[in-house]
């Protein structure tokens, strides 16, 4: 038998969460009186495990925590992100002032812009919300903003100030440049980014 803590990551909702736990315990007591066999109980997700240890019962559901994310800056220090998504620069190109790139001319150069094409797009889980300067990748240790719209199979980034060449490694996220940080840049959460990763990614 199981339930779910609706706001276990938000300590401003501690009273609500504690009431959920009390309700679940009362439910357990009724169930235990009804059945002669042992019933297994679980209620905690990752945030519940970290914030409400007394509610771990028989099992826990460590979802995002298995990827190394805590949903809490204070608790994040105890976890290490384990996922890395990387690609390579497939093409370099220089845009002149007034030239554009991508769907719907999503980026129009107002200065001479050197761009890198990266073969990863929304079919791989990099949502369109990361386009137009919100999202970014890292090339040779430097941050490169995604410009224009995210395409199905590629993104384009500004490498005007980055020394790089075709074939260079591109870090979309890793232990240092985390999925959490990338997700926050577009106003979303790491859950959405990580669970959007397509099967074709190796």
State each model region's role.
Residues 2-88, 95-96:
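Active-site loop/helix belt of alpha/beta enzymes
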Residues 94-202:
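C-terminal accessory subdomain/extension
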């Amino acid at each position: 038998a199981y339930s779910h803590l609706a706001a276990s990551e938000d300590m401003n909702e501690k009273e609500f969460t504690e009431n959920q736990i009390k309700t679940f315990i009362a439910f357990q007591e009724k169930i235990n009186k009804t059945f002669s066999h042992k019933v297994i109980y679980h209620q905690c997700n990752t945030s519940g495990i970290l914030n409400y240890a007394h509610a771990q019962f028989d099992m826990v559901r460590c979802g995002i925590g298995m990827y190394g994310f805590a949903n809490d800056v204070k608790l994040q220090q105890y976890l290490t992100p384990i996922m890395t998504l990387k690609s390579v620069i497939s093409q370099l190109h220089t845009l002149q002032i007034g030239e554009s790139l991508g769907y719907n001319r999503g980026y129009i150069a107002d200065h001479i812009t050197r761009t890198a094409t990266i073969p990863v797009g929304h079919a791989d889980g990099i949502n369109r919300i990361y386009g137009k300067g919100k999202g970014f990748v890292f090339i040779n240790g430097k941050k490169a903003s995604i410009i224009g719209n995210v395409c199905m199979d590629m993104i384009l980034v500004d490498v005007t100030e980055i020394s790089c060449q075709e074939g260079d490694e591109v870090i979309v996220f890793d232990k240092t440049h985390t999925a959490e940080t990338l997700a926050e840049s577009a106003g979303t959460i790491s859950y959405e980014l990580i669970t959007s990763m397509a099967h074709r990614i190796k």
